[in-house]
């Protein structure tokens, strides 16, 4: 057995209950092509393979790649790419593997220290969304980050990440996963979430403006929004716009829903 390596933030999932929850949330069918990021020892991979048409796994650890090839390399619906998912060009690497091209779902237990960059690569950004969105993305991530993904406006966990992700996808909590479900146990609890990329109901007229507005608005979270945005709009004018949207002029960034952020950006766009 390959030992978990701290440099890659590795923790082996061992809970059958958590694995059951992940597989159920993935809603796999025999037509699905799955992308798994960081398969580790393959405990989740082995659960998924009998259920899907194809599974593409991306693993950075060479020792784990050797283990996975030895154990699963003979499976016709399994393909392993060795490399860093954040920098790997999947399209180029899959040119000669048509069966594994354009995966439609993601199912993964990802390294917690790069959760944000991974989600951004999967979803894209407000200004540059993924042009070929996945049907669903099921992730096992740090609980604190999970809470920010599906947080509602007005809650203590609602922030810039909430807005950026919720603009592009519906976010759903699946289950909690305690630290004891892993070897070695991480210092934090975890959770399974499901993201479903969707068509934007009321899109921002200028997505880049919205992106910048959200960044500025959450720059100093405890301050009122009209203070955080005074570099782009006069305070009194912002108060008028907020009232027009039925938002308290003394609201803070976390009090404003994702849709209200879009509406505010659109109003500022016609100033």
UniProtKB/Swiss-Prot annotation:
Catalysed reactions, semicolon-separated: adenosine(1518)/adenosine(1519) in 16S rRNA + 4 S-adenosyl-L-methionine = N(6)-dimethyladenosine(1518)/N(6)-dimethyladenosine(1519) in 16S rRNA + 4 S-adenosyl-L-homocysteine + 4 H(+)
E.C. number(s) listed in UniProt: 2.1.1.182
InterPro entries per the UniProt record, alphabetical: KsgA/Erm, rRNA_Ade_diMease-like_C, rRNA_Ade_Mease_Trfase_CS, rRNA_Ade_methylase_Trfase_N, rRNA_adenine_dimethylase, SAM-dependent_MTases_sf
Chief localization: cytoplasm
Statement: the UniProt record of this protein carries the keyword rRNA processing: yes
Residues engaged in binding S-adenosyl-L-methionine: 11, 13, 38, 59, 84, 109
Subcellular localization: Cytoplasm
Domain of life per record: Bacteria
Keywords for the protein's UniProt record, in alphabetical order: Cytoplasm, Methyltransferase, RNA-binding, rRNA processing, S-adenosyl-L-methionine, Transferase
Listed Pfam families: RrnaAD
GO cellular component: cytosol
Any GO MF annotation of the entry: RNA binding
UniProt cross-references to Gene3D superfamilies, sorted A to Z: Ribosomal RNA adenine dimethylase-like, domain 2, Vaccinia Virus protein VP39
Top-tier EC class: transferase
Family recorded in the similarity comment: Belongs to the class I-like SAM-binding methyltransferase superfamily. rRNA adenine N(6)-methyltransferase family. RsmA subfamily.
Physiological role: Specifically dimethylates two adjacent adenosines (A1518 and A1519) in the loop of a conserved hairpin near the 3'-end of 16S rRNA in the 30S particle. May play a critical role in biogenesis of 30S subunits.
HAMAP family listed in its UniProt record: 16SrRNA_methyltr_A
Name of the protein: Ribosomal RNA small subunit methyltransferase A
Native source organism of the sequence: Trichormus variabilis (strain ATCC 29413 / PCC 7937) (Anabaena variabilis)
